Amino acid sequence: MIRVLVVDDEALIRTGFQRILAAADGIEVVGAVSGAEALRTVREQHPDVVLLDIRMPDVDGLTVLGDIRRLPDPPVVAMLTTFDMDEYVETALRSGAAGFLLKDTDPEALPPAVQSLARGGTVLSPKVTRTVVDGYLSAGPQERPSKALQRLTGREREVLVLIAEGLSNADIAARMHLSTGTVKDHVSAILTKLEVSGRVQAALFAQRAGLLTEGAG
C-alpha cells in the first residue's frame, strides 16, 4: 500500500487529488492544508509520497521541502505547481524534489505518477514549459547538451533516456536486462559526467538535449 500526503491550502485542489488517488487500488491518501500540518503528518504517519504545493500561506513550500528532506528516512516529495510558478521549479529540484506536477494534471495520469514516485522514479509533467527546462539548465554547466552527451557511453545514454521517462533503477534494470547494481553504477556515472546532482536534473538535461524524441541512439 502506498501512503500519500497531499499538501495544498486550496480545498478544491487538495480534495480533488485526494479523491482521485483514493479511488486507485493500492493507494491510501490523507491531506494537509499548511506547511506546519504537513510536517506534523509526515512525522506521525510516515507517508511514502508527498505532493506538496510550492506556495502556501503559512510556510513556503520550498522551506517545507527542505525540512522534510532533513528528516530521517524522508518520503519522496513532488511539488505541485502552476504555470505562473515556473520560477520556483529550479530551487525545488535543487532542494531534492523528485519532480513536479501541474495542478491541472490529467486525473488518469495521477495514480501512475504516484506509483512511479513510490518506486523511486521521477515525475515531470508532460506540460513542462521549455522555459522551465532551459531556465533550470542555464544554471548548470555552460556548454551545449550535445557536447556533454559526448562524455556518455552508448549504454549510459540508454539509461539516461529511461531516467527521463521516469523509470526507477529497478524498472531500468528489468527493461535493459541488467542488475540493479549495474544500473546504479550507470546512474552515478551519468550524474558525474553531466555535472548534475540528481535524477530529475538528469531527466531535464535529456529533455533539453532532445533525447526523448530521438531516442538514445
Regions found by a protein language model. Name each.
Residues 26-34, 41, 196:
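Short hydrophobic/Thr-rich beta-strand motif most characteristic of the beta2 strand and flanking loop
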Residues 34-37, 60-63:
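Acidic catalytic/metal-coordinating carboxylates
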Residues 53, 81:
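Active-site residues of response regulator receiver
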Residues 56:
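Receiver (REC) domain active-site loop signature in two-component systems and cognate sites
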Residues 88-94, 104-154, 158, 208-212:
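Short, flexible helix-to-coil linker/hinge segments that flank and couple to helix-turn-helix
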Residues 144-182:
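Helix-turn-helix DNA-binding segment
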Residues 166-201, 205:
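Recognition helix of helix-turn-helix DNA-binding domains
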